[in-house]
Amino acid sequence: GTVFNTVGSDILAILCRQIGIPLYVLTPMIKVDTRPVYGYNRLSPMPFDYGPRLAGAWDMEAKERVDFRGIKLLEIAPEYIRSLITEKGIIPSSAFFHEAMEYARFLEEV
């Protein structure tokens, strides 16, 4: 049930928990990453260089004075998530691991 999402999603998750509003995450099952089960470790949080996107037209001298490094995706722990809404239905975060592994097996058969 762990989710990786854009910057600010972590703050929203904490806020929702604090004020008692359930957090739902929309995601297609195809985005589920089961590689960690097999030993692959994903970097968390994911670093990202925003320079090309934010300062593509800047002159080089101006670009060199600004640090554009940031984080692209942050981890949101399952305890902050009520359920994930997918094409397979609404899945509680506590049940998502089982559904993800089932979906991964389905993809291997296709």
Residue positions per predicted region:
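Conserved phosphate- and dinucleotide-binding cores of soluble alpha/beta proteins
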Residues: 1-109
